[in-house]
């Protein structure tokens, strides 16, 4: 990307991205093109991170291990659903992922947990996500029973209108009362250590830029 184009992109992203400074946006753009590699920009060719490349970043950099959650995080970043994360989606996505307000993070986490995109988190969705995050005990005859119990306990705590599923309003109320419930169904945000390490590595003088 030529300097003029890069400057224009940096300015436009900085204007619309309240959590990053111009310098930080520039660093994230640099990192994006480092990760994508040398790709010639051509008409009709999408330059971006595909699902595997992005999941690799989530795993290696932010320690995520749950395939289902990583897949949903990818979809959360890939706003236009073209199967690829563009440089704009990368910067906007990281803005919430790394530095979002509680409101932004609640909206993001709810979208991640709403597996089928119907604006509710159903019992089935809770079951699938909690099943992945719990370790099975070899002695358990029916490990699913414990997960079903956990789903019922979670609903009791979070389902404020008692309709057997979680709307965003239910989820928001529960999280505002107890912020630990933000990632109730699995880690989909970076832990503080990964976040500070990532930022320390990326937000430095571009002249001494290394890949993360």
From Swiss-Prot:
InterPro entries reported for this sequence: EF-hand-dom_pair (IPR011992), EF_Hand_1_Ca_BS (IPR018247), EF_hand_dom (IPR002048), Recoverin (IPR028846)
A molecular function (GO) held by this record is: calcium ion binding
Instruction: Show where the EF-hand domain sits.
Output: 65-100, 101-136, 146-181
So where does Ca(2+) 2 get bound? 114, 116, 118, 125
Q: In which tissues is it expressed?
A: Expressed in trachea multiciliated cells.
Sorted UniProt keywords: Calcium, Cell projection, Cilium, Cytoplasm, Cytoskeleton, Flagellum, Metal-binding, Repeat
UniProt cross-references to Pfam families, sorted A to Z: EF-hand_5, EF-hand_7
Is Cytoplasm given among the entry's keywords?
yes
- What are the subcellular locations of this protein? Cytoplasm, Cytoskeleton, Cilium axoneme; Cell projection, Cilium; Cell projection, Cilium, Flagellum
Which residues are recorded as binding Ca(2+) 3? 159, 161, 163, 165, 170
- For this entry, list what GO says about its biological process: cilium movement; outer dynein arm assembly; regulation of cilium movement; regulation of flagellated sperm motility; regulation of signal transduction
- Where is Ca(2+) 1 bound in this sequence? 78, 80, 82, 84, 89
An annotated GO cellular component? sperm flagellum
Q: What does this protein's UniProt record list under function?
A: Component of the outer dynein arm-docking complex (ODA-DC) that mediates outer dynein arms (ODA) binding onto the doublet microtubule. Seems to regulate the assembly of both ODAs and their axonemal docking complex onto ciliary microtubules. Regulates ciliary and flagellar motility and is required for cilia-driven determination of body laterality.
Record's subunit section: Component of the outer dynein arm-docking complex along with ODAD1, ODAD2, ODAD3 and ODAD4.
- PANTHER family per the record? CALAXIN (PTHR23055:SF75), CALCIUM BINDING PROTEINS (PTHR23055)
Name it: Calaxin
């Amino acid at each position: 990307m030529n300097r003029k184009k890069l400057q224009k992109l940096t300015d436009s992203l900085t204007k619309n991205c309240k959590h990053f400074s111009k310098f930080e946006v520039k660093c994230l753009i640099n990192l994006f093109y480092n990760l994508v590699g040398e790709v010639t920009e051509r008409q009709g060719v999408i330059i971006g991170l595909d699902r595997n490349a992005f999941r690799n970043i989530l795993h290696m950099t932010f320690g995520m291990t749950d395939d289902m959650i990583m897949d949903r995080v990818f979809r959360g970043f890939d706003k236009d659903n073209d199967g690829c994360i563009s440089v704009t989606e990368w910067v906007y996505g990281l803005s919430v992922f790394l530095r979002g307000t509680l409101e932004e993070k609640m909206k993001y986490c709810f979208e991640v947990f709403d597996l089928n995109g119907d604006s509710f988190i159903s019992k089935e969705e809770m079951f699938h996500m909690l099943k992945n995050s719990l370790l099975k005990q070899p002695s358990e005859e029916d490990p699913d029973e414990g997960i079903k119990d956990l789903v019922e306990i979670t609903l009791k705590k979070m389902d404020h209108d008692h309709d057997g599923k979680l709307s965003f309003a239910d989820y928001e109320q529960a999280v505002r009362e107890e912020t630990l419930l933000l990632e109730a169904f699995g880690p989909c945000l970076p832990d503080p250590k990964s976040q500070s390490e990532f930022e320390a590595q990326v937000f430095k003088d571009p002249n001494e830029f290394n890949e993360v």
